[in-house]
Amino acid sequence: MPGTKKLILVVIDGLTPDVFEAAAESRSAPTLAGLAEAGTYARATATFPSLTPVCLASLATGGAPDVHHIPHLVWYHRGEKRVVEYGSSFGAMRAVGARRSVKDAIVEMNAEHLARDAVTVYEALEDDGLVAAAVNVPCYRGRTRHVPTVPGVVRPVNGPRRFFYYSLFESDVTGAPLAVGGRAKGSIDAYAAAVGRWLVTRDGFDFLFFYLPDYDFASHALGPSGADEALARSDRAVGALVEAAGGLEAFLDRYDVVLCSDHGQTQVEQPFRLESALSDFRLFRPNGRRDDAELAVAASNRAGMVYLLPAAQVEPRAVAERLSEEAALDVVIFREGGDTIALREGAELGLGPDDNGWRGRARHALANPNAGDILVSAAAGVELTDLGGRHHVGGGSHGSLLDGD
């Protein structure tokens, strides 16, 4: 396509609008400031639940959760009668089986869980003869088979033609450092920067999805207003692309650039165990599961889901009304007949069919065939503990329908 510029999508995980705007204005993130000055800026809205696998699947497919079928960081697989855990924490991964969790996060999310008819941007572009590239993107399904760099860890996968995934999959030899050698100091973003520099130097793609997760990692630990050092590292990673092209002007002459986050973050002040509100039901246990279980609970960060199992002798409304009494929960959502119902403090909220705000996002989330029968959005300052009992109190989290998330 003569005259068509190539495109780079940069996603800085967990970067909030307030932090971005302050960094751009103060120029503490000079590359981001330069891009903001050269382009246009607007605030965007994440999907619900506003969690990385869900949001990145939406970015990769252009579809809402009811289209791509990724419902949460953790969910109950009705067909396989087990819990899928993509990595809420190491404790949560151990609770379901660490090897199984690694396989789900790296392989099965793309090979099996992502809807077959939700075409990814990599698939669409390469079907048209263009070269797609992805760096560290968890949602990567493409047309090209890739073998892992470490045999036996996971099986081969199908990704874009140029595919780099945390040193585990590398379509090309770039000389980039190991991605997992010091996460708190930005090792993953440093790996992405080295790979991105290599790609831009060779002009080796028509589309690049460039994903930087280290800011989110720091923000979980330090809070959204305390991760300035991590943002500076993310800025340098984007700067590596700019430098490889010969400076900002040359970079923007060659590429169109979209820079965004996948979701926001808000401060966490208290944990809440969703299972505690349902203790008089028989609950499914990820290890040592019980065949007489009535409910399965999937919770992490600031969103949760409850599944009614075949043994349950209760309607979704009864469970939802129980949950809506909890001060730790802001909104509880469920289906009744063909209607989507939302409860807040026991009162029913209207969900009009044409609402494009939080109500529309809630409907799309509940319509996902892998979602629970009841969805919950945590109240401000509350985080739902994961299967390992972990939370981010004192730091930041996300997942809810509230604006900051």
Which residues make up each language-model segment?
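Extreme N-terminal starter segment of soluble prokaryotic enzymes
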Residues: G3-I8
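Short, solvent-exposed loop/turn segments at the edges of secondary structure
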Residues: P53-V54, L252, E269-R273, L278, ...
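Short secondary-structure boundary/capping segments
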Residues: A24-R27, P148-G152, G223-D228, P271-L278, ...
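Glycine-rich, histidine-containing beta strand-loop boundary motifs that form or position
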Residues: L9-I12, T45, A134-P138, Y211-L212, ...
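Short, structured active-site-proximal loop/turn typified by the sulfatase FGly-forming signature C/S-X-P-X-R
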Residues: E21-I70, V74, A133
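His/Asp/Glu-rich, glycine-adjacent segments
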Residues: G63-P224, A327, V331, D339-L351, ...
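Metal-dependent active-site segment of extracytoplasmic phospho-/sulfohydrolases and closely related
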Residues: L9, T31, R233-S276, V376
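Active-site neighborhoods of enzymes that stabilize oxyanions during catalysis
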Residues: D117-A118, D291-D405
